[in-house]
């Protein structure tokens, strides 16, 4: 079950990506519980995701939001797009994202779109390959965003100036 809910607390945008009912089979029958996948971000290069499980939907969402707020990471953006084309993978999911010109918008599907919206990317072209399981797509997207470097970071690693690096 895919759901999208947006809310704002303080300076963070929160998005609910997916709610899923899961069952534990026991001798007396099935015990149902719920899982929730959420992302939070400040729209300015900070993003985190959370995965919560509980017997009731609101409790699962609340747990996921708390985990997402504790799990915030920084991403180096270039204005409102990416620094350079990037690939990310997690488990069976692979994602490819590339910067886009002003006015393109977010061309991404499902879970990837939610992550890119809360991190503050406004122009991007992206594609998910392999498994489109929302949890793995979110993790692959965050993997790609974390591995993205600005020209300043790359120049510092190589011991060059930015002008020498860019030629």
Swiss-Prot record:
GO molecular function: rRNA binding; structural constituent of ribosome
Intrachain S-S bonds: none
Keywords linked to the UniProt accession: Ribonucleoprotein, Ribosomal protein, RNA-binding, rRNA-binding
InterPro entries: Ribosomal_Su5_D2-typ_SF, Ribosomal_uS5, Ribosomal_uS5_bac-type, Ribosomal_uS5_C, Ribosomal_uS5_N, Ribosomal_uS5_N_CS, Ribsml_uS5_D2-typ_fold_subgr
Gene Ontology cellular component list: small ribosomal subunit
GO terms classed as biological process: translation
Pfam families xrefs: Ribosomal_S5 (PF00333), Ribosomal_S5_C (PF03719)
Domain S5 DRBM per the UniProt entry, residue ranges: 12-75
Family under the similarity heading: Belongs to the universal ribosomal protein uS5 family.
Assembly and interaction partners: Part of the 30S ribosomal subunit. Contacts proteins S4 and S8.
NCBIfam families: rpsE_bact (TIGR01021)
Function: With S4 and S12 plays an important role in translational accuracy. Located at the back of the 30S subunit body where it stabilizes the conformation of the head with respect to the body.
Domain characteristics, as noted in the entry: The N-terminal domain interacts with the head of the 30S subunit; the C-terminal domain interacts with the body and contacts protein S4. The interaction surface between S4 and S5 is involved in control of translational fidelity.
Protein's recorded name: Small ribosomal subunit protein uS5
């Amino acid at each position: 079950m895919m759901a999208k809910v947006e809310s704002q607390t303080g300076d963070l945008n929160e998005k609910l990506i997916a709610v899923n009912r899961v069952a534990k089979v026991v001798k007396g029958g099935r015990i149902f519980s719920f899982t929730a996948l959420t992302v939070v971000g400040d729209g300015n290069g900070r993003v985190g995701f959370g995965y919560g499980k509980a017997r009731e939907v609101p409790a699962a969402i609340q747990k996921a939001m708390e985990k997402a707020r504790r799990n915030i990471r920084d991403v180096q953006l270039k204005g409102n797009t990416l620094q350079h084309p990037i690939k990310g993978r997690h488990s069976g999911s692979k994602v490819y994202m590339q910067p886009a010109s002003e006015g393109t918008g977010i061309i991404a599907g499902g879970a990837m779109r939610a992550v890119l919206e809360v991190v503050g990317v406004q122009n991007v072209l992206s594609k998910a390959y392999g498994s489109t399981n929302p949890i793995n797509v979110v993790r692959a997207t965050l993997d790609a965003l974390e591995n993205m470097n600005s020209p300043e970071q790359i120049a510092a690693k190589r011991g060059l100036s930015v002008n020498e690096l860019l030629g």
